[in-house]
């Protein structure tokens, strides 16, 4: 879409009074979330309190595991649970997570809480800015504030700020990796390194970047990820030995599987296809099922990304193949509601700027896609608070329908973009110019 036309469309948002109102709405959203986090603050404890979850993910997944790592205690092992007030050892994150969060483990917990809340808020603002800039747009001050506020009020944005999960970091890394995969491989590799904190992000991301023919970016990113992981494991091994480190990692894996809240049958937040199917079937899959399903679910998207990448005009994060990649990452393997932040940048591009060319996707498909991607952002029905107040039967049809809606919408969105990629792959190359490739458009 033409930038001058977009400037005219969004001119009202840049009026000073409108900007002030938008800023007020943004500040109210951040303040209200901060107040809720304070009122329902999760005190350090060896048991999980579902009624007080304020910054619980930051405490249990970032602060104490990173503190343990810095002090030479294996954050994946039961030894961490014995030493710190935490209900469960760390999931199988890459050690890179503990390296880059190390500065946050230096101050006292309350001070670190404030710093991380502000950091998470800033990253939501960065995602809004990335959605505009990666659609090759500029000078949309009012729109940026509006999008920033939308993210703060959105379901994944709110829960990210409230529980203190580090989702925004993983999302920013993934988007950077996809946006610069064709043009700036080293920067793309750095994005991969940031996304490598959680295997459920980086593993499908690597495969899809390869299918997109971003070979140099993958090579650089793999080198950085392996180096970062080895440095972290080497640090832990220096306090014990490699076998103890491996044993501790296995303890963390078993602790995750032993947590009933992680079962698809019990959760109200799962987005991935296996999670949705397992909920309906009352089935608890194991690691091999998740990994095998991911590989199967990557086949068709990967093949169509390979074919479509030869013809696509927008090779940035808001283009067709990047949108396929983001959706495939979410539906192919274990993900929760907060992970739908991964769709924010493509959603902004598609909804506000028509970032996928009409030659690649008809208007009806783009509008349908924009609505489907908005559902996980706006769906506050699939929350513990609503489900409890509504008194729904966890095994009932209504409960299953509400809690499966996000995953179903993402899967339908994936079908639409895969259909568009297949149509594009059958066309004669539309002569993509070097300038378009360099700009990501």
Give, region by region, the residue ranges found by the protein language model:
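Hydrophobic/aromatic-rich transmembrane helices and adjacent perimembrane loops
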Residues: 336-353
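Hydrophobic alpha-helical transmembrane segments of integral membrane proteins
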Residues: 99, 152, 195, 200-201, ...
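Aromatic-enriched
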Residues: 353-441
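Membrane-embedded alpha-helical segments of transport systems
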Residues: 121, 197-199, 227-231, 375-379
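Primarily membrane-embedded glycan-assembly and transfer machineries that use lipid-linked glycans
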Residues: 2-187, 209-340, 397-401, 427-441
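Hydrophobic transmembrane alpha-helices
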Residues: 108, 195, 346-347
């Amino acid at each position: 879409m033409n930038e001058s036309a977009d400037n005219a469309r969004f001119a009202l948002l840049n009026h000073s009074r409108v900007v002030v109102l938008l800023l007020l709405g943004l500040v109210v959203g951040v303040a209200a979330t901060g107040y809720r986090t304070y009122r329902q603050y999760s005190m350090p404890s060896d048991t999980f309190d579902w009624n007080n979850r304020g910054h619980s993910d930051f405490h249990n997944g970032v602060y104490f595991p990173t503190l343990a790592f810095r002090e030479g205690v294996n954050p994946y092992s039961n030894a961490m649970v014995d030493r710190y007030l935490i209900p469960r050892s760390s999931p199988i994150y890459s050690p890179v997570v503990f390296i880059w969060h190390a500065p946050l483990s230096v101050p006292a917990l309350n001070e670190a809480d404030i710093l991380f809340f502000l950091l998470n808020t800033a990253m939501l603002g960065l995602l809004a800015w990335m959605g505009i800039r990666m659609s090759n747009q500029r000078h949309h001050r009012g729109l940026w504030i509006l999008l920033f506020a939308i993210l703060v009020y959105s379901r994944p944005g709110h829960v990210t700020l409230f529980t203190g999960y580090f989702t925004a970091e993983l999302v920013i890394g993934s988007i950077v990796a996809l946006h610069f995969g064709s043009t700036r491989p080293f920067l793309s590799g750095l994005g991969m390194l940031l996304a490598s904190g959680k295997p459920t992000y980086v593993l499908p991301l690597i495969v899809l970047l390869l299918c997109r023919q971003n070979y140099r970016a993958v090579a650089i990113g793999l080198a950085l990820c392996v180096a970062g992981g080895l440095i972290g494991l080497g640090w832990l091994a220096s306090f014990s030995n490699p076998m103890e480190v491996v044993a501790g990692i296995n303890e963390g894996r078993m602790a995750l599987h032993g947590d009933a809240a992680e079962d698809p049958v019990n959760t109200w937040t799962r987005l991935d296809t296996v999670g949705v199917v397992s909920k309906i079937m009352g089935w608890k899959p194991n690691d091999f099922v998740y990994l095998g399903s991911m590989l199967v679910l990557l086949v068709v998207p990967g093949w169509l990304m390979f074919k479509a990448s030869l013809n696509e005009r927008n090779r940035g994060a808001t283009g067709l193949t990047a949108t396929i990649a983001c959706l495939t990452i979410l539906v192919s393997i274990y993900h929760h509601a907060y992970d739908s932040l991964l769709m924010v940048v493509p959603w902004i591009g598609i909804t506000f700027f028509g970032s996928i060319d009409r030659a690649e996707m008809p208007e009806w498909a783009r509008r349908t896609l924009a609505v489907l991607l908005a559902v996980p952002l706006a769906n506050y029905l699939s929350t513990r608070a609503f489900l409890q107040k509504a008194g729904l039967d966890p095994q009932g049809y209504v409960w299953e329908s509400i809690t499966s809606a996000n995953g179903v919408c993402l899967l339908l969105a994936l079908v639409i973009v895969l259909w568009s990629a297949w149509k594009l792959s059958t066309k004669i190359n539309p002569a993509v110019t070097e300038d378009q490739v360099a700009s990501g458009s």
